[in-house]
Amino acid sequence: MDIPTDQRPTYQDFFDISEEGINIIANADIAFDNSLKNAEYLNENTCYALTRQELIGDRLVPFEQAHPSQGCKSGFSQDVWMFLGPIRMKDCHTVTAFSNTTGKYEEIPFTIGVPGCDNVLAAKLKTKYQVKNPAQHINCIHHHANQKRVPYSHRMTGGPTTWGIIHQGNIPISGL
């Protein structure tokens, strides 16, 4: 579904256009395999916040194994958000973030792709949903052509912004 905007959409933009059925918000470089069928276990009170797997060659590698030098943990990274039915979130247009330029905290648009945005969203979602990370049951596959990263002007780490960690759960398919 397209969001009519001339800028990167905010999380609230995505939430506002959600409909009945399964709604998936994902980074543009994410794909799924047949394991996506396991989203059928989602209910209206649960959000799936999935940690990605890296596609290295022809092999899927867990997030934390693909980034060992960064000390990455799977609960600190989500690239996909799944909901059943209209998403019950409000006030997700802006967020407080640290400016790498000014060295101060300031309000910025709350968009996908800013370091820490997934953790801030996790904390917000926990106020309305049971948030689970069944990444062992639904493969969220990261297709990043190279490992170069664009420097970010802001980051959502520390300071006044609340973070949430969503650890992967090895939950039986019948109850994901």
Label the model's feature ranges.
Residues 1-26, 31:
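Active-site-proximal specificity loops/subdomain of glycosyltransferases
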Residues 23-25, 47-50, 130-137:
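A structural signal for short, well-ordered beta-strand segments and their strand-loop junctions
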Residues 15, 30-123, 127:
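Conserved catalytic core of nucleotide-sugar-dependent glycosyltransferases
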Residues 94, 99-103, 107-176:
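C-terminal catalytic/acceptor-binding lobe
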Residues 3-9, 55-58, 139-141:
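A short acidic, often aromatic-flanked loop/helix-cap motif at beta-alpha or helix-coil junctions
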